[in-house]
Amino acid sequence: MNFNLRQAIMANIQGSNEQEVEATIVDAIQSGEEKMLPGLGVLFEVYWKNCNEQQKDQLCEQISQGLQ
């Protein structure tokens, strides 16, 4: 059996509205559970693929500042 975690996560969140996406992110961060990390990674990938270069630069700058 070939299980693709990314596809499973996408199938689970496909069609989510803005409030549902935010609730998913907030819940994942507040729970602090490592099992939520793949889902956040998929959400990040979706965001990244839909950003222009300026948005990507701003995001990387914000993350970099947050890591200081």
Swiss-Prot record:
Keywords of this entry? Sporulation
Q: What InterPro entries does its record include?
A: SspI
Its subcellular locations are: Spore core
Q: What induces or represses its expression, per the UniProt entry?
A: Expressed only in the forespore compartment of sporulating cells.
Q: Name one GO biological process term.
A: asexual sporulation
Q: Please, which domain of life does this record's source organism belong to? A: Bacteria
Pfam families from the xrefs?
SSPI
Give the UniProt family note.
Belongs to the SspI family.
Q: Which NCBIfam families match?
A: SASP_sspI (TIGR03092)
Recorded protein name is: Small, acid-soluble spore protein I
- Taxonomic lineage: Bacteria, Bacillati, Bacillota, Bacilli, Bacillales
Primary gene name? sspI
